[in-house]
């Protein structure tokens, strides 16, 4: 009996545990799901929920003012964000995988999955990010059950053939350019899919269970097969965090518009028109940006 339960754990045959949360670390029903979400108390992978804010959050390809956004500027905006996150998290250890979801569903939009080489590194990052802010928004950090991203990513999206668009329940991983990849990862190969660390048979079943799981996807999207609860679910409403501005200032080193707001030395937000694509070699280094952020934090904490 125990062997049977272990063999079906995390699959559609498991009527107790949610297979979507187990494989993807997110479920559209959230806490209202009829199956259990077994949240790990420790993991080599952390998720920063809804952290990446696309410039076209309301309508794809259009900014908040209804103006079309240059795809180059959108990619530039994303790569600025990616570089910021990678450099900050690299302080805690070697980042093996950093995936940013390009999905549009509430429970997956902007999710950032970070897998470290060692579990202790993930714990250090998890603890350090508690109560911090990024770009004026609290950071929501949790341990994620995902350790093998091959089972979590959408193959059809990678082949440009996913007909579910941004509302697919598998990860649509947004890609960075080759230049930034070489800069961040150097000669080592970026393991974008991660790796399974558990010796349990449930991690060795391979593509058979993944294909069975995918065949059940349409029933899940329709709310059938034992799933209950409304859409949306998990993640964007209940922000938690500290009282002061910490770790923020990101998301807008080169871009423009409302998403690219800067913070001056007094912590006040100032708006500017979108600058042109920066091609000048004069650009702040990561150390200079971090020094400014630390200065802002100290000044805000010293204020009565």
Swiss-Prot record:
Segments of skewed composition (Gly residues): 221-258
Functional summary from the UniProt entry: Necessary for the splicing of pre-mRNA.
Encoding gene (name): U2AF35B
UniProt keyword Zinc, yes or no: yes
SUPFAM superfamilies: RNA-binding domain, RBD
Ranges where the RRM domain occurs: 44-146
Zn-finger region bounds: C3H1-type: 12-40, 148-175
Basic and acidic residues biased stretches: 208-220, 281-304
Key words, A-Z: DNA-binding, Metal-binding, mRNA processing, mRNA splicing, Nucleus, Repeat, RNA-binding, Zinc, Zinc-finger
Protein name: Splicing factor U2af small subunit B
Source organism, top-level taxon: Eukaryota
Record field: compositional bias (Basic residues): 184-207, 268-280
Region (Disordered) residue spans: 184-304
Localization terms from the record: Nucleus
One GO biological process term: mRNA splicing, via spliceosome
GO cellular component: spliceosomal complex; U2AF complex
Similarity-based family: Belongs to the splicing factor SR family.
A GO MF label: pre-mRNA 3'-splice site binding
């Amino acid at each position: 009996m125990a062997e049977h339960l272990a063999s079906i754990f995390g699959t559609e045959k498991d009527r107790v545990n949610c297979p979507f949360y187990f494989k993807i670390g997110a479920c559209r029903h959230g806490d209202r799901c009829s199956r259990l979400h077994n949240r790990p108390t420790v993991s080599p992978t952390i998720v920063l929920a809804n952290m990446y804010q696309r410039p076209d959050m309301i309508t794809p390809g259009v900014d908040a003012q209804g103006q079309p956004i240059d795809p180059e500027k959108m990619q530039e905006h994303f790569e600025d964000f990616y570089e910021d996150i990678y450099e900050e998290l690299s302080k805690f250890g070697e980042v093996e995988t950093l995936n940013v979801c390009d999905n549009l569903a509430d429970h997956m939009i902007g999710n950032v999955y970070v897998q470290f080489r060692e579990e202790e590194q993930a714990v250090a990052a998890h603890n350090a990010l508690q109560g911090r802010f990024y770009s004026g928004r609290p950071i929501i950090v949790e341990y994620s059950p995902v350790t093998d991203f091959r089972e979590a990513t959408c193959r059809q999206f990678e082949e440009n053939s996913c007909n579910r668009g941004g509302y697919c329940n598998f990860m649509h991983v947004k890609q960075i350019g080759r230049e930034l990849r070489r800069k961040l990862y150097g000669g080592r190969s970026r393991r974008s899919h991660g790796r399974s660390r558990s010796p349990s048979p449930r991690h060795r079943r391979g593509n058979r269970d993944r294909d069975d799981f995918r065949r059940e996807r349409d029933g899940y999207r329709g709310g059938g097969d034992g799933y209950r609860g409304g859409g949306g679910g998990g993640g964007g409403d209940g922000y938690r965090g500290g009282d002061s501005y910490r770790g923020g200032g990101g998301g807008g080193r080169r871009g423009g518009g409302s998403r690219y707001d800067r913070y001056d030395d007094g912590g006040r937000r100032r708006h500017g028109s979108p600058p042109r694509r920066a091609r000048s070699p004069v650009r702040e280094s990561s150390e200079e940006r971090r020094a400014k952020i630390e200065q802002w934090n100290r000044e805000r904490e010293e204020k009565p």
